[in-house]
Amino acid sequence: MFSMMNGLQHYGQQALRAARYIGQSFMVTLEHMNRLPITVQYPYEKIIPSERFRGRIHFEFDKCIACEVCVRVCPINLPVVDWELIKSMRKKQLKSYSIDFGVCIFCGNCVEYCPTNCLSMTEEYELATYDRHELNYDQIALSRLPFSIVQDSTIQAHSSLGYLS
């Protein structure tokens, strides 16, 4: 008789614990029902990245002194810098500069350590192509200014998503 009472008491405690867990999960569900949706209809609505976002690298050819600091600080030695030495002036002249964004890890070391600030990170994040060789940007493609989401009237920009800031 005593073991039956213990079993019944244990069963009652388990039932109360299960009801408490169900109540807690129901409260979490109700809390999430009051939140705004975070899904964005991507091609028509775009999120404005934060100021610290690391997007495509912008390059200014005229400022570069071909010091190759960007190549030395890059963890994967990615930027390809071609230069020639002008013996009369004892100075390097930049011939070409390219970055393969298919390999780039967007760490930002090249931008941070550049002594002339000829490199900068943009807010451009749409780099998708059908051919991976199109991701190899030369100095002309790198110097192209990024297209701003805010200026496009056909796209609705979202900046109110707090988790991306």
Curated annotation (Swiss-Prot):
<feature type="binding site">
    <location>
        <position position="74"/>
    </location>
    <ligand>
        <name>[4Fe-4S] cluster 2</name>
    </ligand>
</feature>
<dbReference type="InterPro" id="IPR010226">
    <property type="entry name" value="NADH_quinone_OxRdtase_chainI"/>
</dbReference>
<dbReference type="GO" id="GO:0048038">
    <property type="term" value="F:quinone binding"/>
</dbReference>
<dbReference type="InterPro" id="IPR017900">
    <property type="entry name" value="4Fe4S_Fe_S_CS"/>
</dbReference>
<keyword id="KW-0521">NADP</keyword>
<keyword id="KW-0472">Membrane</keyword>
<feature type="binding site">
    <location>
        <position position="104"/>
    </location>
    <ligand>
        <name>[4Fe-4S] cluster 2</name>
    </ligand>
</feature>
<dbReference type="GO" id="GO:0008137">
    <property type="term" value="F:NADH dehydrogenase (ubiquinone) activity"/>
</dbReference>
<feature type="binding site">
    <location>
        <position position="64"/>
    </location>
    <ligand>
        <name>[4Fe-4S] cluster 1</name>
    </ligand>
</feature>
<comment type="subunit">
    <text>NDH is composed of at least 16 different subunits, 5 of which are encoded in the nucleus.</text>
</comment>
<feature type="domain" description="4Fe-4S ferredoxin-type 2">
    <location>
        <begin position="95"/>
        <end position="124"/>
    </location>
</feature>
<dbReference type="Pfam" id="PF12838">
    <property type="entry name" value="Fer4_7"/>
</dbReference>
<dbReference type="GO" id="GO:0005506">
    <property type="term" value="F:iron ion binding"/>
</dbReference>
<keyword id="KW-0520">NAD</keyword>
<feature type="binding site">
    <location>
        <position position="114"/>
    </location>
    <ligand>
        <name>[4Fe-4S] cluster 1</name>
    </ligand>
</feature>
<dbReference type="GO" id="GO:0009535">
    <property type="term" value="C:chloroplast thylakoid membrane"/>
</dbReference>
<keyword id="KW-0793">Thylakoid</keyword>
<keyword id="KW-0934">Plastid</keyword>
<keyword id="KW-0411">Iron-sulfur</keyword>
<feature type="binding site">
    <location>
        <position position="107"/>
    </location>
    <ligand>
        <name>[4Fe-4S] cluster 2</name>
    </ligand>
</feature>
<keyword id="KW-0874">Quinone</keyword>
<keyword id="KW-0618">Plastoquinone</keyword>
<feature type="binding site">
    <location>
        <position position="110"/>
    </location>
    <ligand>
        <name>[4Fe-4S] cluster 2</name>
    </ligand>
</feature>
<feature type="binding site">
    <location>
        <position position="67"/>
    </location>
    <ligand>
        <name>[4Fe-4S] cluster 1</name>
    </ligand>
</feature>
<comment type="similarity">
    <text>Belongs to the complex I 23 kDa subunit family.</text>
</comment>
<feature type="binding site">
    <location>
        <position position="70"/>
    </location>
    <ligand>
        <name>[4Fe-4S] cluster 1</name>
    </ligand>
</feature>
<keyword id="KW-0677">Repeat</keyword>
<keyword id="KW-0479">Metal-binding</keyword>
<keyword id="KW-0004">4Fe-4S</keyword>
<keyword id="KW-0408">Iron</keyword>
<comment type="function">
    <text>NDH shuttles electrons from NAD(P)H:plastoquinone, via FMN and iron-sulfur (Fe-S) centers, to quinones in the photosynthetic chain and possibly in a chloroplast respiratory chain. The immediate electron acceptor for the enzyme in this species is believed to be plastoquinone. Couples the redox reaction to proton translocation, and thus conserves the redox energy in a proton gradient.</text>
</comment>
<dbReference type="GO" id="GO:0019684">
    <property type="term" value="P:photosynthesis, light reaction"/>
</dbReference>
<keyword id="KW-1278">Translocase</keyword>
<dbReference type="InterPro" id="IPR017896">
    <property type="entry name" value="4Fe4S_Fe-S-bd"/>
</dbReference>
<protein>
    <recommendedName>
        <fullName>NAD(P)H-quinone oxidoreductase subunit I, chloroplastic</fullName>
        <ecNumber>7.1.1.-</ecNumber>
    </recommendedName>
</protein>
<feature type="domain" description="4Fe-4S ferredoxin-type 1">
    <location>
        <begin position="55"/>
        <end position="84"/>
    </location>
</feature>
<dbReference type="InterPro" id="IPR004497">
    <property type="entry name" value="NDHI"/>
</dbReference>
<keyword id="KW-0150">Chloroplast</keyword>
<dbReference type="GO" id="GO:0051539">
    <property type="term" value="F:4 iron, 4 sulfur cluster binding"/>
</dbReference>
